[in-house]
Regions:
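Extracytoplasmic
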Residues: 20-54, 160
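Helical-face signature of the major facilitator-like transporter fold
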Residues: 28-33, 65, 99, 107-111, ...
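Residue-level signature of mid-helix packing/kink "hotspots" within the transmembrane helices
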Residues: 37, 65-73, 123, 157-158
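Membrane-interface helix termini in secondary transporters
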Residues: 45, 76-77, 166
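Helix-breaking motifs and short loop linkers at transmembrane-helix boundaries and internal kinks
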Residues: 51, 83, 104-110, 138, ...
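Conserved MFS/SLC helix-loop-helix module at the cytosolic interface between two early adjacent transmembrane helices
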Residues: 70-109
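Cytoplasmic helix-loop-helix junction between adjacent transmembrane helices
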Residues: 114-151
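Helix-loop-helix hairpin linking two adjacent transmembrane segments in secondary transporters
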Residues: 149-178
């Protein structure tokens, strides 16, 4: 039998989760989405500097999703063995390294390899986040938490354009903005 005190404690705990955990997960999803679409913004400068044509970019976009597709199941199987917290942190570190490695792109092949690796690294992120929320949010609050989490996707599109535009005009040393 639940008492009014128990219900109040549960309500306060859920509120804390929404105020403390969900914004962090939201931010991680924004970073994930921006990382996925950033090459679309960098395309114009990359075309000029590297000489890539539309076919190279189209193939690179497709190869990302091939890596994403092929590594979703293995990533989720590992997620169960390693643990959600460690697995998501590891994925983010790997995709950060892969994203940083984009500065070394000189050929279409290197572009394809890095796009595939980025897709593979990001494959387990979204399912892992949903599982993570399942562990933290009770069933009565989970749908609302996931719905709020999902709004990070369109928000990333809104804030990603200006951020990408600013990054493209930055030139540090001999490094291009992309």
């Amino acid at each position: 039998m639940t008492t009014a005190t128990d219900l109040d404690l549960e309500r306060r705990t859920i509120r804390k989760l929404f105020l403390r955990l969900l914004p962090f997960l939201f931010l991680l999803y924004i970073v994930s989405y921006l990382d996925r679409i950033n090459v679309g913004f960098a395309k114009l400068q990359m075309q000029g500097l590297l000489g890539f044509d539309e076919r190279v970019f189209g193939t690179g976009f497709g190869i990302f999703f091939a890596g994403y597709f092929f590594f979703q199941v293995p990533s989720n199987l590992l997620l169960e063995k390693v643990g959600v917290r460690r697995w998501i942190a590891g994925l983010m570190i790997v995709w950060g390294f892969v994203s940083c490695s984009m500065i070394f792109i000189r050929t279409p092949f290197s572009f394809y390899v890095l796009r595939f690796l980025l897709g593979a690294a990001e494959a387990g992120f979204f399912p892992g986040m949903i599982l993570y929320m399942k562990h933290w949010f009770p069933s009565g609050a989970r749908a609302r938490a996931v719905a709020l989490f999902m709004t990070a996707n369109p928000l990333a599109g809104v804030i990603g354009s200006p951020i990408s535009g600013l990054l493209l005009v930055l030139h540090i040393g001999k490094l291009a903005g992309w």
